[in-house]
């Protein structure tokens, strides 16, 4: 296959991906806080420059724009998600990354999907933040190569302004990604200094941008209210940092961060087994203590993934008791440590250590701030999930670079395309029904308002488990915001029902 044909196929697969994601994004309804951002409430927040609301200035501006145009929203969602897939492929430098990324993103846990992707307000913070962060990771990823391009170690003035701007953008969207980017900025400078004995001006500029952005974000008066527990919604470590961290971990983090990633975890486990089997064939060390450590790590991960699968199937809609939560939370720690140990040992053996270590630290660092704040939702874990996908693909790169696997690549690609295609059609069916019902109910309400009725029934949407805050209930704050967004008189009462009474 010549270069032109490869480029044509590359453009074709991304064009198809873009088209399907655009169609899907178009069907996503505006829900929950979207109704506030897209109404006068959003403009009021803008007029005060979000004072005492949040320091997510870039994220706030994005959601203000996206809640005013479904076309703009659909284009932004499509561009960001396609961009994430493209940037992951740039990091891995293999075309198979495209197919793995699509399959694993389609298998995103439902709770994360509805809060971080389907919900426009969630997308504006959590998808955009990791998209912009990946841009900088792509820019610096070469520093972890075994034999880096020495030409890249030169001082470059030209990109400095753009890097300062990128650093500021990455620290003005969502808080945990803000802190991650500050750590990323200084860590890159220190790593390059110790490994290459240089300090590159472009890295310093990015770090300076993150410092400026972080200072500006946390200068918002809302963070003083949060830190003093005077905010009515958000708080920091009320009962002490350790007790808050334990509460957050066992209540939310272990499930949303790791355990609920069923498909991703099983995929990583399969790749680990492929690596281990080939390692045993190649190395005499596989029979010594190191080999036993690797086998033990695999055993723990296998038991954990099996438990996670059974827990998801059997207890997915059941409130778990304290004992089970403690067992699962503790098992998650054991499985996570086992995965890191296994990956780092294999990375050392197959000369991929620094990239694996960087991604592993990134996954941990991205979630670390969530231990200290309250509340945290499923949407907070989308950036971590994307980094987990990168981690999985780095493990795949160990396989691709070091082993001869007797599997037809075309078959693997067809399997991935089939899974991705079925997944997209599944979601298109789900959200086409949601889109139709959403437009029908607003038309119904407007007809009733035109007829002079003051008490109107509002029908629940189908498949509400895929949507965040889909239907306003009478007396809730969402009822007021829904009416503002759709220009329904405030003296009209909306009563949510599953079936119209007449």
Where are these regions (language model features)?
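Short hydrophobic alpha-helices at membrane interfaces in multi-pass membrane enzymes
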Residues: 142-168, 204-205
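Intrinsically disordered, polar/acidic, low-complexity terminal segments
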Residues: 3-49, 53, 63-83, 93-97, ...
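Transmembrane alpha-helix segments characteristic
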Residues: 99-108, 207, 285-310, 348-371
């Amino acid at each position: 296959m010549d270069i032109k044909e490869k480029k044509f196929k590359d453009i074709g697969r991304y064009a198809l991906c873009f088209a399907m994601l655009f169609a899907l994004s178009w069907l996503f309804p505006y829900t929950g806080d979207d109704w506030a951002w897209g109404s006068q409430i959003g403009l009021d927040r803008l007029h005060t420059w979000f004072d005492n609301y949040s320091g997510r200035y870039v994220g706030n501006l994005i959601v203000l724009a996206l809640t005013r145009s479904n076309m703009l929203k659909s284009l932004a969602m499509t561009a960001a998600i396609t961009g994430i897939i493209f940037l992951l492929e740039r990091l891995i430098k293999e075309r198979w990354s495209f197919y793995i990324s699509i399959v694993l993103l389609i298998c995103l846990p439902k709770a994360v999907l509805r809060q971080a992707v389907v919900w426009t307000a969630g997308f504006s913070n959590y998808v955009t933040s990791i998209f912009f962060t990946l841009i900088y990771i792509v820019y610096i990823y070469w520093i972890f190569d075994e034999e880096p391009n020495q030409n890249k170690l030169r001082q470059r003035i030209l990109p400095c302004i753009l890097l300062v701007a990128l650093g500021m953008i990455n620290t003005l969207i969502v808080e945990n990604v803000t802190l991650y980017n500050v750590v990323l900025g200084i860590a890159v400078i220190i790593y390059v200094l110790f490994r290459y004995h240089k300090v590159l001006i472009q890295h310093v500029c990015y770090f300076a941008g993150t410092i400026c952005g972080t200072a500006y974000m946390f200068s918002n008066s809302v963070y003083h209210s949060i830190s003093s527990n005077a905010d009515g919604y958000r708080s920091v470590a009320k009962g002490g940092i350790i007790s808050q961290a334990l509460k957050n971990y066992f209540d939310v983090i272990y499930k949303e961060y790791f355990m609920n990633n069923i498909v991703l975890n099983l995929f990583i486990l399969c790749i680990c087994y492929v690596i281990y089997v080939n390692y045993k064939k190649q190395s005499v060390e596989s029979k010594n203590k190191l080999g036993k450590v690797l086998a033990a790590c695999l055993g723990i991960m296998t038991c954990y993934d099996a438990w996670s699968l059974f827990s998801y199937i059997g207890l997915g809609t059941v409130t778990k008791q304290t004992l089970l939560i403690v067992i699962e939370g503790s098992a998650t720690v054991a499985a996570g440590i086992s995965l890191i140990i296994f990956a780092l040992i294999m990375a050392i053996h197959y000369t991929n250590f620094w990239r694996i270590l960087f991604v592993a630290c990134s996954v941990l660092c991205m979630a670390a701030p969530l231990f200290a704040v309250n509340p945290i939702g499923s949407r907070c874990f989308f950036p971590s999930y994307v980094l987990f996908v990168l981690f999985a693909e780095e493990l795949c790169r160990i396989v691709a670079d070091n082993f001869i696997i007797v599997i037809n690549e075309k078959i693997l690609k067809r399997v991935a395309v089939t899974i991705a295609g079925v997944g997209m059609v599944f979601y298109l069916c789900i959200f086409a029904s949601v889109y139709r019902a959403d437009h029908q109910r607003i038309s119904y309400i407007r007809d009733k308002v035109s007829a002079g009725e003051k008490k109107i029934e509002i029908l629940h949407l189908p498949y509400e488990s895929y949507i965040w805050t889909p239907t306003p209930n009478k007396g809730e704050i969402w009822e007021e915001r829904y009416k503002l967004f759709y220009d329904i008189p405030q003296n009209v009462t909306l009563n949510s029902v599953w079936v119209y009474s007449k």
